[in-house]
């Protein structure tokens, strides 16, 4: 079914969908698995859910996003958030650089959308949401996916931030800016930046993640515009 077809008699479709969700009779539709090729030639596994499933995913995201914005996401995190994008990350970075913190521990997270289960992701959400019936439905929505954070769903961007928020919470006291899955910590010496690199690595390890070593480094003499570049 296309979006155009869904819109025909949409009120009735939404009422029926709400009833299925309320009674527990809802089941997910078939997924179309695709491979997206980036401009650098890298291939990223992705999925295309049915229109109805995307409606469910968007509704669930709309329900939990305000809660996570208030309880889970740090002020220094941009990307996958309303009003917080690469521009806000660059502004925050420029402020730290202008204050004299010219050494940057720059860490890109390796395969952030891989290596989790529906039950595990639901446990992350349960740290902030106490509604048991919602959490059970949330887990049911994730279970058919090849990976709960796989690109292509309406929930994936939010869940990437939820996953990384668990590492973010371990980085208190540092001048940190994160854009999507890229951390930068601003320091006043090489030694401090090396320590920050270790702190990020340790925080990620506690969450089952690790840096992409090919894209992570300590550097200085950087302009804000050089940071958070998308390399595909």
Give the positions of each predicted feature:
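Conserved polymerase palm-domain catalytic core
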Residues: 75, 90-221
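Generic preference for hydrophobic/aromatic residues in regular secondary structure cores
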Residues: 28-33, 211-218, 227
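Short, low-order "capping/linker" segments at domain edges
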Residues: 224-232
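Conserved pre-catalytic core of RNA-dependent polymerases
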Residues: 1-150
């Amino acid at each position: 079914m296309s979006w155009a077809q869904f819109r025909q008699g949409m009120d009735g479709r939404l009422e029926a969908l709400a009833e299925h969700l309320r009674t527990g009779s809802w089941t997910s539709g078939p997924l179309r698995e695709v491979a997206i090729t980036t401009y650098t030639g890298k291939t990223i596994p992705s999925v295309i859910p049915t229109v109805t499933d995307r409606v469910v995913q968007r509704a669930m995201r709309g329900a939990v996003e305000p809660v996570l914005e208030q309880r889970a996401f740090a002020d220094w995190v941009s990307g996958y958030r309303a009003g917080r994008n690469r521009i806000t990350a660059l502004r925050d970075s420029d402020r730290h650089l202008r204050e004299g913190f010219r050494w940057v521990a720059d860490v890109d997270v390796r395969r952030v959308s891989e290596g989790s289960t529906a039950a595990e992701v639901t446990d992350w959400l349960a740290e902030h949401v106490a509604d048991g019936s919602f959490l059970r439905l949330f887990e049911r929505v994730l279970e058919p996916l090849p990976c709960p954070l796989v690109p292509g769903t309406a929930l994936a961007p939010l869940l990437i931030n939820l996953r990384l928020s668990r590492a973010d919470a371990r980085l208190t006291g540092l001048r940190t800016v994160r854009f999507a899955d890229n951390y930068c910590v601003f320091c006043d010496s090489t030694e401090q930046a090396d320590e920050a690199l270790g702190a990020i690595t340790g925080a990620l390890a506690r969450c089952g993640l690790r840096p992409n070593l090919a894209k992570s480094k300590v550097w200085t003499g950087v302009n804000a515009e050089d940071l958070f570049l998308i390399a595909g």
